[in-house]
């Protein structure tokens, strides 16, 4: 977006902060800001702090649903609400900033297309990352209609060392360090380039930067302010000059649980991992091999979905044995037997949803200590200090589904709001969730 276009946008008197429970519920407020001309219709940057990428796609949703926003909102859920906005043409750049325990997508820059699959009319992507392949979302470029380009940057943020929490009172801030160093480094105002020490070729032949980010470790396995400074400079270079962006924070960025691990026994969870395991293609797979990989994966998931849907109606031994006779599904017998021994009526739909998270990597699970939460808060604060002010902020609590621990969510929410107030002054906070939605 040009500087002239950004100047034509309306400005909020105070920075709006929308706080919701389920993450996809932030979307109506982003669309409202587009409608009121506080955000542009296209080329919005989206900075996303989260333990989960949320970059999947509703598998069977017609692509044209994105052009009816009310229908769109009703189709989305917590893991798949960002990509439809990309296909609608609003987001062109997503920066996923994640903690060290979340490793679902490879680090670096991913440039790919998001469009309508000509054969199914659903939304699909050209990315060959395991995250998309394992959900059956890849198609070749020539199979897409109305493709939109997406620049996805995946960046690791580590907590700041405890002894540096009061660094601001003792010496230079990160922001000051960057300003002092700007004379020594040319900062390109382009969304396509990050100056870094090394780069590597991606599977699609594009050069991916190796980020000088906060994953640079110290002896205490936490980041220093110098590495945080490098990370901030990288993000500043990613954002085009004059670009407006939405700042999005899921509170499970600071502390996260895998709720399915508490629903099922260790043996049951292991069986789900076996049933839903994803066979990765080789690193240098040809397009035909990738297409075959996705087709096989889609058939695998469809068979499992059909099996558990059948169990909702009839989970007798005969039905289970019939499904277990299919290749790769023999462990269904042991799984259903174990579930029925513990539960009067197993929720087979929920079991399938749990299985879908057991493909190539487990859901992140790290219940943070107060010290770890504070270290991440300090790191987020130092990073945001260096960035332009966002147009609006969205916060997701993610506590009712137990991704952010319910006993910590209120504490984390207040701490995050305190950070935002310290950076941006008065806030226009909207609490869009039911009171008492956590146990804290």
Curated annotation (Swiss-Prot):
Paired cysteines (S-S): none
- A Pfam match is UPF0489
Superkingdom, taxonomy of origin: Eukaryota
**Residue ranges with Low complexity bias:** 188-200
Q: List the residue ranges of the region (Disordered).
A: 187-207
The stretch of residues making up the signal peptide is none
The family classification in the record reads:
Belongs to the UPF0489 family.
Q: Which PANTHER family match?
A: MISEXPRESSION SUPPRESSOR OF RAS 6, UPF0489 PROTEIN C5ORF22
UniProt-recorded name of the protein: UPF0489 protein C5orf22 homolog
List the source organism.
Xenopus tropicalis
Upper lineage is: Eukaryota, Metazoa, Chordata, Craniata, Vertebrata
């Amino acid at each position: 977006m040009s500087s002239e276009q950004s100047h034509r946008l309306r400005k909020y008197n105070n920075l709006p902060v929308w706080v919701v429970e389920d993450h996809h519920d932030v979307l109506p407020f982003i669309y409202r800001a587009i409608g009121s001309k506080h955000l542009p219709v296209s080329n919005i940057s989206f900075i996303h702090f989260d333990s989960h990428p949320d970059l999947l796609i509703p598998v069977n949703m017609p692509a044209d649903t994105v052009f009816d926003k009310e229908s769109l909102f009703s189709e989305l859920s917590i893991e798949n609400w960002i990509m439809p906005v990309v296909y609608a043409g609003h987001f062109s750049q997503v920066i996923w900033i994640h903690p060290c325990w979340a490793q679902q997508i490879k680090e670096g820059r991913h440039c790919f297309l998001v469009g309508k699959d000509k054969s199914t009319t659903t939304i699909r992507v050209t990315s060959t990352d395991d995250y998309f392949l394992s959900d059956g979302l890849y198609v070749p470029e020539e199979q897409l209609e109305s493709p939109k380009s997406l620049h996805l940057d995946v960046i690791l943020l580590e907590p700041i060392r405890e002894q540096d929490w009061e660094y601001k009172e003792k010496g230079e801030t990160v922001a000051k360090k960057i300003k002092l160093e700007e004379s020594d480094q040319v900062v390109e105002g382009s969304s396509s380039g990050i100056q870094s020490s090394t780069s590597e070729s991606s599977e699609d032949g594009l050069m991916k930067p190796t980020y000088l980010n906060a994953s640079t470790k110290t002896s205490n396995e936490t980041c220093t302010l110098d590495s945080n400074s490098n990370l901030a400079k990288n993000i500043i270079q990613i954002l085009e000059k004059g670009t407006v962006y939405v700042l999005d924070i899921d509170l499970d960025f600071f502390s996260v649980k895998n709720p399915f691990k508490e629903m099922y026994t260790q043996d049951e969870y292991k069986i789900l991992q076996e049933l839903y395991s994803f066979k990765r293609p080789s690193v240098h797979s040809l397009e035909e091999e990738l297409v075959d990989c996705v087709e096989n994966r889609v058939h695998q998931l469809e068979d499992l979905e059909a099996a558990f849907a059948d169990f909702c109606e009839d989970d007798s031994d005969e039905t289970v044995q019939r499904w277990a006779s299919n290749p790769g599904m023999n462990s269904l017998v042991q799984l259903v037997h174990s579930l029925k021994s513990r539960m009067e009526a197993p929720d087979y739909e929920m079991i399938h949803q749990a299985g879908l998270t057991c493909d190539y990597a487990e859901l992140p699970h790290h219940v943070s200590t107060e010290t770890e939460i504070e270290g991440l808060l300090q790191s987020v604060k130092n990073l945001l200090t260096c960035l332009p002010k966002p147009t609006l902020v969205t916060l997701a609590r993610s506590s009712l589904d137990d991704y952010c621990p319910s006993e910590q969510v209120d504490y984390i929410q207040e701490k995050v709001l305190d950070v935002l107030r310290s950076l941006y002054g008065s806030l226009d906070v909207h609490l869009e969730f039911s009171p008492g939605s956590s146990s804290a």
